[in-house]
Amino acid sequence: ASYSPGFALFILGGTGCRKSTAIGLALSYFGAFHAKNLPASFDDTSNTIRKKAFILKDCPIVVDDYHPETSLQERRRMESIAQSLSRAFGDGTDRGRLKADLSLREAMPPRGVAVMSGEDMPNIGDSGTARFYVVNVGQQDVPITEELTEAQEMAKRGVLRRVMRGYIEFLQPRADRLSKQLETRWLKLRAQAIKETQGAHKRAPEALAHIMLGYSMMQDYLVSVGAMTDEEANADFLDAWRVLVENSTEQGKEAREERPSKRFISAISELLVNQTVTVKDLSIHSATAEKGMIGYVDADYYYLLPEMSYTTVSRLYSDQGMTFPLSKRLLFRQLRDDGIIVPDADGKTTKSKSVGGKIVRLLWIPRRFLDGDT
């Protein structure tokens, strides 16, 4: 088909929830894998992982174990890998690089799909995390049951690999017409996903369509060999679709809460509450700036000093070993576009205000955003 996957699956769950067990079992359709011998991990270098992703054509590559780190250097190393991989799998591209003689090195873009796992989400900004389709795994979601043990025994005996071989043999005689059929089915699934995932990230419908396309094709094979009936396949498809729609919608809500604009407002609010910074009441104080002052307030608005407020939040992030994900200019645009600040008549992000007899340009923020009334 003409539409390649533009996402990586990210399995998110705390230690001990057996997410690697589930991933290893799924990967057993492609080889002799289990939780302890997955193809790659975040302890590998970015170049190593990308080379493996190029070699594993038409196969999933698992990158396991993104975990919290007390070492700032190690945390940033893993974040850099996550950022690199999100771009590579989200865009299907490879970085342009030169050889020692300055000639172009052959590109090695990913040629399969990626499954990553971690105890935490990488701090790689809006754009980076948007390329992940996140599945949360709770402590009780992968229980140790007879069914799990039986599935692991089947994987160990190579049963799952034989199922995948049968599926590929099922596809082979259909290869000439598959491209058009897959494209038509994918477009239909995406259109339906767009209707049903209002509020989700714009990338979510495409990811959902790709996942369900693969799911439905495997169902076609299982029906053809009598492993399930058409009625069972339809019921399972609708159930899986419902779960993915709900997950996509929830992921969209979480992403909005993690937008830099929301994080900026949350940081300012916290700094005001703990009195690390202050604002002057325009009905009482003059315009004289004091240490820790980041703006002004009246009955309706907070008026933040643009440079001071941005620098203060950036410093807060730096003190926590993080980098605020947007430049000042892009942040203010996002605040405007999200309806958090009131722009001037020309759409500029700062607006004139008379303070102590002087006209200054400030960020106008309705009080409800910082006082916790939204």
Indicate residue ranges for each PLM-predicted region.
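Conserved helix-loop functional segments at active or binding sites
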Residues: 1-4, 28-41, 68, 88-96
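P-loop NTPase catalytic core of nucleic-acid-dependent motor ATPases
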Residues: 1-36, 208
